[in-house]
């Protein structure tokens, strides 16, 4: 019997033994850099001439790994493999499926620093962020294992005399999982194992910038006893392989995390019924946000500045939950701005293998150029308070940037930047602050810093986001504690790490028997 779920503790790097263990893991992983990784289809290794090369964003000439690249023919084989495996996997006892997740969690826990070190090298994550990513991956495995056992009990419904009624859940079929690079382990793990533990089979297309850590995880599932064909690893082009998988008539479920533009396009494609398709596809998408930290007049201003800083600059702002907007009551605007700027100027930016660096690089050259172009727009729209500089000579580094005095309709107040940039805007009162906070097409996370109980209750009703936090940062959701997913163009409000998430991967069935 499984013990009650509790989240994986974060590593305390003030402890010397933990620091040494992590440094050793970084060294071990560095010796593994540059290796080749095959596709995995029906448990078989498939090597292709065409490769996806994964580069360290902090050392852009350092090859992390070379991964075989799938084409449409191989994507077809992966779909057929998943479809065949589904015929048996769907009937495996849910407790047995859950136990595979628990075993996988134990394997990653034993190799926790190793997986975090891969994230440092491949995704450019600083120690603390990489450690949290790995811990979240473990959490998804442990939490969903327990949730599946609970879900397998079904739901109680009524029966009449002489009639027995049951209501339970059944798997859907082949699932296409398209995972992002920013939580290259955690979100990839969560969106892959949720369909697996519910009895579906998976074709996994990881982000092309972080395919190596995904390959490492598929190996973990194999070691944990997952039968061949239940997960198929097919990195490839979104336009070629991604579209093919989404369009396929045997695809039953699609789970995607990424940009709004790609997510909306995927949603549209999935709605089309293809020749040979006898079902409507279900789509679970999480598409990002333009998230706001609201600071009230009576707030703790030091807490406000710290909350804005952590929300905006953790992992260089490359989180869908990042607080890229700060909306401050006019009476405390100048003081909060001054405090936040002072904190930002003390942040260190550099190679994330160095524990002393708070921020590492952004993910690649394309992201670097996009963020720098937004900063130039911001300089014209508002007042640059700190940062604004970038250096791509050895890696893709951008200084933490604060732009003040922005109109709520300004470009950098409206569009997702996905970088270390936070925009400040002034509110006349609390009603006005909430109005500004809600005036984007997104609705993912938000935070309110206030001591006013009436304003807390008002924000609960009126701040239209899926994850709302009070008197803390708007990032850092923990599986099982803060089910995660947003409104409007942030996605389908499918609450990852929540009690009803697994049911989205299944179909409810009612059985009525007379006796």
UniProtKB/Swiss-Prot annotation:
Q: What EC number(s) does the entry state?
A: 1.2.1.88
Q: What residues sit in the active site?
A: 286, 320
The record ties this protein, via Pfam families, to: Aldedh
BP GO annotations: glutamate biosynthetic process; proline catabolic process to glutamate
Q: Which UniProt keywords apply?
A: NAD, Oxidoreductase
Q: Which domain of life is it from?
A: Bacteria
Membrane-crossing residues? none
Which pathway is it part of? Amino-acid degradation; L-proline degradation into L-glutamate; L-glutamate from L-proline: step 2/2
Checking SUPFAM superfamilies in the record gives:
ALDH-like
Query: Which CDD domains did the record assign?
Result: ALDH_PutA-P5CDH-RocA
Under the heading Gene3D superfamilies, the entry gives: Aldehyde Dehydrogenase, Chain A, domain 1, Aldehyde Dehydrogenase, Chain A, domain 2
Family membership, please give it.
Answer: Belongs to the aldehyde dehydrogenase family. RocA subfamily.
Protein's name according to its UniProt entry: 1-pyrroline-5-carboxylate dehydrogenase 1
The organism is Halalkalibacterium halodurans (strain ATCC BAA-125 / DSM 18197 / FERM 7344 / JCM 9153 / C-125)
């Amino acid at each position: 019997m499984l013990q009650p779920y509790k989240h994986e503790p974060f590593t305390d790097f003030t402890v010397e033994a933990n620091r040494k263990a992590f440094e050793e893991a970084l060294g071990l992983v560095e010796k593994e850099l540059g290796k080749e990784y095959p596709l995995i289809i029906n448990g078989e290794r498939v090597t292709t001439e065409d490769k996806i090369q994964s580069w360290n964003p902090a050392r852009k000439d350092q090859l992390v790994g070379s991964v075989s690249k799938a084409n449409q023919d191989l994507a077809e084989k992966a779909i057929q493999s998943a479809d065949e495996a589904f015929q048996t996997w769907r009937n495996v006892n849910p407790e047995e499926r859950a136990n595979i997740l628990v075993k996988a969690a134990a394997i990653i826990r034993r190799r926790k620093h190793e997986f975090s070190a891969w994230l440092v090298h491949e995704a450019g994550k600083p120690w603390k962020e990489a450690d949290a990513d790995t811990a979240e991956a473990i959490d998804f495995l442990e939490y969903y294992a327990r949730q599946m056992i609970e879900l397998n009990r079904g739901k109680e419904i009524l029966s009449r005399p002489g009639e027995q009624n049951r209501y339970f859940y059944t798997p859907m079929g082949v699932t296409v999982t398209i995972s992002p690079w920013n939580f290259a382990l955690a979100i990839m793990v969560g969106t892959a194992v949720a369909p697996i533990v519910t009895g579906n089979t998976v074709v996994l297309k990881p982000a092309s910038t972080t395919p190596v850590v995904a390959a490492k995880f598929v190996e973990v599932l194999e070691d944990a006893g997952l039968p061949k064909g239940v997960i198929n690893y097919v990195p490839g082009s979104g336009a070629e392989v991604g579209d093919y998988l989404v369009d396929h008539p045997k695809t039953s479920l699609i789970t995607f995390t990424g940009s709004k533009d790609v997510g909306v396009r995927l949603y549209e494609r999935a709605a089309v019924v293809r020749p040979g398709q006898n079902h409507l596809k279900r789509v679970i998408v999480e598409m990002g946000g333009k998230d706001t930290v609201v600071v009230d007049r009576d707030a703790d201003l030091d807490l406000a500045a710290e909350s804005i800083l952590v929300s905006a600059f953790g992992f260089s702002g490359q989180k869908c939950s990042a607080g890229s907007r700060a909306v401050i009551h006019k009476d405390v605007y100048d003081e909060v701005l001054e405090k936040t700027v002072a904190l930002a100027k003390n942040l260190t930016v550099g190679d994330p293998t160095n524990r002393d660096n708070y921020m590492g690089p952004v993910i690649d050259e394309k992201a670097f150029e996009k963020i720098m172009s937004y900063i130039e727009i911001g300089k014209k729209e508002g007042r640059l308070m700190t940062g604004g500089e970038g250096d791509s000579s050895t890696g893709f580094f951008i200084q933490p940037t604060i732009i003040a005095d922005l109109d709520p309709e300004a470009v950098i107040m409206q569009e997702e930047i996905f970088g270390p940039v936070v925009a400040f805007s002034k509110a006349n009162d609390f009603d006005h602050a909430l109005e500004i906070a809600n005036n984007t097409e997104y609705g993912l996370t938000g935070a309110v810093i206030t001591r006013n109980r009436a304003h807390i209750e008002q924000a609960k009703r009126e701040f239209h986001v899926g994850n709302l936090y009070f008197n803390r940062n708007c990032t850092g959701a923990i599986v099982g504690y803060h089910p995660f997913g947003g409104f409007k163009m942030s996605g389908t409000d499918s609450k990852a790490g929540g009690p009803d998430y697994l049911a989205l991967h299944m179909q409810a069935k009612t059985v009525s028997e007379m006796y």
